[in-house]
Amino acid sequence: MSGATGERPFSDILTSIRYWVIHSITIPSLFIAGWLFVSTGLAYDVFGSPRPNEYFTEDRQETPLITDRFNALEQVKKFSEVN
């Protein structure tokens, strides 16, 4: 038989009760876990990105743009220092 891999056909998997019992639990669980990861702020801590209220400080209200590519590290240090 050419083309037979011995695997279960995809249509059989999708019409299986077992498939939907497993995935009716895992898909909403992944969605809820992702929502909690972002809404609790843990995503900001894990990836090191600033929270929305940390983009601008009291002293610096302008957009922190890097303008000199050769002295970029000094500019980043200046922007990230806490006053």
Curated annotation (Swiss-Prot):
GO cellular component: chloroplast thylakoid membrane; photosystem II reaction center
PROSITE patterns for this protein: CYTOCHROME_B559
UniProt cofactor(s): heme b
GO molecular function annotations of the record: electron transfer activity; heme binding; iron ion binding
Cysteine pairings via disulfide bonds: none
Binding-site list for heme: H23
Keyword vocabulary terms for this entry: Chloroplast, Electron transport, Heme, Iron, Membrane, Metal-binding, Photosynthesis, Photosystem II, Plastid, Thylakoid, Transmembrane, Transmembrane helix, Transport
Gene3D superfamilies given in the database record: Photosystem II cytochrome b559, alpha subunit (1.20.5.860)
Subcellular location: Plastid, Chloroplast thylakoid membrane
Protein name: Cytochrome b559 subunit alpha
Naturally occurring in which organism (per UniProt): Chlorella vulgaris (Green alga)
Gene behind the chain: psbE
